[in-house]
Amino acid sequence: MLFLAPGYIFPHVATPVTVAIDFAQAVKEGAYSFLDLKASPVPNPELFQPPSRVSIGMTGGREERNEEIIRGPLNYLLSLPGKDIRGKLIDALNEWFRVPEDKLSTIKEIIVILHTASLLIDDIQDSSQLRRGNPVAHRIFGVAQTINSANYAYFLAQAKLADLNDSRAFDIFTKGLLKLHRGQGMELYWRDNLICPTEEEYVEMVSCKTGGLFYLAVQLMQLNSEVTVNFSSFINLLGIIFQIRDDYMNLQSGTMTKTKGFSEDLTEGKFGYPIIHSIHAAPNDQQLIQILKLKTNDEVIKQYAVRYIESTGSFIYCREKLDLYLQEANETFQGLELLLGPSKGIRAILNFLRTR
């Protein structure tokens, strides 16, 4: 997830040099992979005036080269194709919202930047080796440079809010990032202290971590739309389905093995959904907890762990819960269609989430 909650948009510098920040081309080329919050005015609305360029304290002719260096890890990950489920969701929702194209492009850029930055930090926090089938950024650029690039990216995304010309966007953005950090913080706490959460605690965490970024996009879209329907429940459901499916695929999918490594959640010591169920299904058996504690790369041990999870009925349970959540999401979707009309894009996303 995310690493640093951002503050104000433009730092005050003695001799600022204007550097254009434009991710639109990357978005167009597809080069990258819940709570209702009442918005309030930003501390200083003047910070939101166009043009949407970032002033940074660098002088002379080196700023362009320096910008490439600073953004190196970010640009590296942007260049690796991903599923782009968030971009597809934004496009699908816009069948209802009808956000103007320029505003929609800005919102996509913001979400792409935030998601990519969060992956840079995720991979460091999880000691990951692969991302999208390639070496993680910090193995190439180093940990310190990657952290700095990710943090820099949060402010790039924040600066893009000016293009929306709505001071409420700052409040939505800030509260959204706080929520994302809360979810990530709890997941890291459970992992590092070897505390297995309950299913309810897991769902609450996912609502912050995964569903939170989905809903941030929705809130920014609704600033530029006449549609005022509350989407929080539906988006929350999509986030839960997406994360449970991801946890399931991590332990069961050959495709996931190629892109992230075999059963990477076991190596990370992560309490994914099937693992949580398996531990609670046999609370007096310490085998799985001990394997998580090892954070092992040993495939023999990980294969045994997968068989153990299977033996507790946890994969069956996971599939059954996914079906229930998908049924609820489909019923909610049908209600939204009655209000707003059909959406082929949302239906396609729901169909995608059914595949395993």
UniProtKB/Swiss-Prot annotation:
Binding-site residues, Mg(2+) 1: D122, D126
InterPro entries noted in UniProt: Isoprenoid_synthase_dom_sf, Polyprenyl_synt, Polyprenyl_synt_CS
Cofactor: binding details: Binds 3 Mg(2+) ions per subunit.
Pathway recorded for this protein: Secondary metabolite biosynthesis
Catalytic activity from the UniProt record: isopentenyl diphosphate + dimethylallyl diphosphate = (2E)-geranyl diphosphate + diphosphate; isopentenyl diphosphate + (2E)-geranyl diphosphate = (2E,6E)-farnesyl diphosphate + diphosphate; isopentenyl diphosphate + (2E,6E)-farnesyl diphosphate = (2E,6E,10E)-geranylgeranyl diphosphate + diphosphate
CDD domains for the chain: Trans_IPPS_HT
Keyword Metal-binding among record annotations: yes
Gene Ontology MF: a single term: metal ion binding
Keywords: Magnesium, Metal-binding, Transferase
GO process annotations (BP): alcohol biosynthetic process; isoprenoid biosynthetic process; mycotoxin biosynthetic process
Source superkingdom: Eukaryota
UniProt-listed PANTHER family: GERANYLGERANYL PYROPHOSPHATE SYNTHASE (PTHR12001), PYROPHOSPHATE SYNTHETASE ATMG, PUTATIVE (AFU_ORTHOLOGUE AFUA_8G02400)-RELATED (PTHR12001:SF70)
Family: Belongs to the FPP/GGPP synthase family.
Name of the protein described by the UniProt record: Geranylgeranyl pyrophosphate synthase penG
Organism name: Penicillium ochrochloron
Source species taxonomy: Eukaryota, Fungi, Dikarya, Ascomycota, Pezizomycotina
UniProt gene name: ptmG
